Amino acid sequence: MAKPEKVSAVAEITEQFKGSTAAVITEYRGLTVGNITTLRRALGEGATYSVAKNTLVKRAAAEAGVEGLDDLFVGPTAIAFIKGEPVDAAKALKNFAKDNKALIIKGGYMDGAALSVDEVNKIADLESREILLAKLAGAMKGNLAKAAGLFNAPASQVARLAAALQEKKAAEGGAAEAPAEAAAES
């Protein structure tokens, strides 16, 4: 690769690092072009999967301010640059690696910190943002319904007490009249 090509490749990779919310570093040894194409489709529109030379990636990472990944840039390396939510892309990579043993997840980078393989897998095991928001909304709706029931309970209790008191007075009034009538008859 000629020097101007290397400079432009480093600049492109640097921009990918800067524009990504997360990156997952993988080893692709043994994958076919068809496998990689399938993986790119599985990652969706929020991620790109790029193969690059390790020396160029190291230089680009340093220029982007990404630290702690140099040990991962050994052997045939490809990087999934993720824009947006990292959960879905990490899940796609984990599932693809499960089905294709040739893909090895080496680690990643997110929120200014290097990630181990276990941390990438933990991210992949999380539920998507939409599902978590739906669960939160459901929990809030249930709690609001309970609160409404609690606020309505005192009013209904007062109404029941008033009705019971009225019935009691009516019964006492009727009971008081009955002995008076019995005394008048005698």
UniProtKB/Swiss-Prot annotation:
SUPFAM superfamilies on file: Ribosomal protein L10-like (SSF160369)
One GO cellular component, as annotated: large ribosomal subunit
One family name in Pfam for this protein: Ribosomal_L10
GO term, biological process aspect, one: translation
Recorded GO MF terms: large ribosomal subunit rRNA binding; structural constituent of ribosome
Keyword Transferase: no
Signal peptide: none
Purpose of the protein: Forms part of the ribosomal stalk, playing a central role in the interaction of the ribosome with GTP-bound translation factors.
NCBIfam families: PRK00099.1-1
Protein family (similarity comment): Belongs to the universal ribosomal protein uL10 family.
Record's protein name: Large ribosomal subunit protein uL10
